[in-house]
Amino acid sequence: MEKHWVLWSCAERWLLALASWSWGLCRICLLPLILTFNMYGGVILLLLIFVSIAGILFKFQDVLLYFPDQPSSSRLYIPMPTGIPHENIFIKTKDNIRLNLILLRYTGDNSSFSPTIIYFHGNAGNIGHRLPNALLMLVNLKVNLILVDYRGYGKSDGEPSEEGLYMDSEAVLDYVMTRPDIDKTKIILFGRSLGGAVAIHLASENAHRICALVLENTFLSIPHMASTLFSVLPMRYLPLWCYKNKFLSYRKIVQCRMPSLFISGLSDQLIPPFMMKQLYELSPSRTKRLAIFPDGTHNDTWQCQGYFTALEQFIKELNSNHCPEANAKTSNVTII
């Protein structure tokens, strides 16, 4: 009994000594922390606020960037063309997401030699909302069109994300290349707004499969847009890892050497027109064009007089130079 009591007493003294030593160590560690906070408390507070804002923005970036539910019926109703040869198509991506496409067929003279435009739309609505624009392209340019609904848009499955949209674009291009009724040497990418970033990425990764690139009212990158839209906040100082979606078009455009047409509406109130000008200047294409429309707004530049004339002239140049690249280096700025 006495032995057990002695052992218990020794263990108790050892535990008390350990607790006393631990407390002393904690006080030693806390002292520099307290001194640091007293000296740099304001800096630490600002850093905590900065990290908190970055965390909130990272979490809600998808909500701020993607609007598949605007208008409210966009996931339920997809307008379809009437009286026009078309196909309503569903394909699968590499990660097994089902995408919805609409193929509009040009059936006029020499239709077997017609170029095919893959149309990447902006960050809201669905492919049906782009039909008025697409049908005018069909008639004026004598081309086939494939309109793409990204994952999470229209009748496509999944949720939108930067990497997801890139995979969607690759799946669409792969599908187009399997069609025996499409001239695979005349594939043109068209991207408006967010679709421009998707088109630039696809072109940068598939230069050997793309005949030409057409960009309309798109941006340099999401960090550039954040600095523009939230100019009162220090967004320009956020490191890239704070951005869930980056879409670094200004870096990728330098890999796009195919003939390129840049369409800029100077009345765009969402994406500053200077971004289109910078993308044009960054482009290494030997055949590049910049068409400027002073009255063009973000979504409605295609309604400006001369819009389809600029596109038609560009496509005629492609046909005369036999895609994908002209031999002579030419650049041109047209104000319409």
Curated annotation (Swiss-Prot):
The lineage's top-level taxon is Eukaryota
Any idea where this protein resides? Answer: Membrane
Major place of localization? membrane
Q: Which InterPro entries match?
A: AB_hydrolase_1 (IPR000073), AB_hydrolase_fold (IPR029058)
The EC number on file is 3.-.-.-
Could you tell me the keywords of this UniProt record? Glycoprotein, Hydrolase, Membrane, Signal-anchor, Transmembrane, Transmembrane helix
Glycosylation site residues: 299
Q: How does it sit in the membrane?
A: Single-pass type II membrane protein
What family does the entry list? Belongs to the serine esterase family.
Note the PANTHER family from the entry: ALPHA/BETA HYDROLASE DOMAIN-CONTAINING PROTEIN (PTHR12277), PROTEIN ABHD13 (PTHR12277:SF81)
The name this protein goes by in its record: Protein ABHD13
